[in-house]
């Protein structure tokens, strides 16, 4: 069986949690917990509350995600 692709949504950082985790409010109003992707961590991209981001979520668990991109 083929692996299902990630779901991408845009959202806004609401709160910074510990261990590089963030609470993100998606466009549809849902709040999820997300962590920073490895490339963003490697390039020291800072994320602050209020930043607009793109989040990738697994179709199997829609309450968690990975922050893939921070909009300028």
Swiss-Prot record:
GO terms for molecular function: ribosome binding; rRNA binding; translation initiation factor activity. GO terms for cellular component: cytosol. CDD domains: S1_IF1. Gene3D superfamilies: Nucleic acid-binding proteins. Component of the 30S ribosomal translation pre-initiation complex which assembles on the 30S ribosome in the order IF-2 and IF-3, IF-1 and N-formylmethionyl-tRNA(fMet); mRNA recruitment can occur at any time during PIC assembly. Belongs to the IF-1 family. Residues 1-72 form the S1-like domain. This is Translation initiation factor IF-1. One of the essential components for the initiation of protein synthesis. Stabilizes the binding of IF-2 and IF-3 on the 30S subunit to which N-formylmethionyl-tRNA(fMet) subsequently binds. Helps modulate mRNA selection, yielding the 30S pre-initiation complex (PIC). Upon addition of the 50S ribosomal subunit IF-1, IF-2 and IF-3 are released leaving the mature 70S translation initiation complex. It comes from the Bacteria. It is found in: Cytoplasm. InterPro entries: NA-bd_OB-fold, RNA-binding_domain_S1_IF1, S1_domain, TIF_IF1. Keywords: Cytoplasm, Initiation factor, Protein biosynthesis, RNA-binding, rRNA-binding. The keyword Transmembrane does not apply. Pfam families: eIF-1a (PF01176). NCBIfam families: infA. It comes from Parabacteroides distasonis (strain ATCC 8503 / DSM 20701 / CIP 104284 / JCM 5825 / NCTC 11152). Its main location: cytoplasm.
């Amino acid at each position: 069986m083929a692996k299902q692709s990630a779901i991408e949504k845009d959202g806004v950082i609401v709160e910074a949690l510990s261990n590089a985790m963030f609470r993100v409010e998606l466009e549809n109003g849902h709040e999820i917990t997300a962590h920073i992707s490895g490339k963003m961590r490697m390039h020291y991209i800072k994320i602050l509350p209020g930043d607009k981001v793109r989040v990738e979520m697994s179709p199997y668990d829609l309450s968690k995600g990975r922050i893939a991109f921070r909009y300028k």
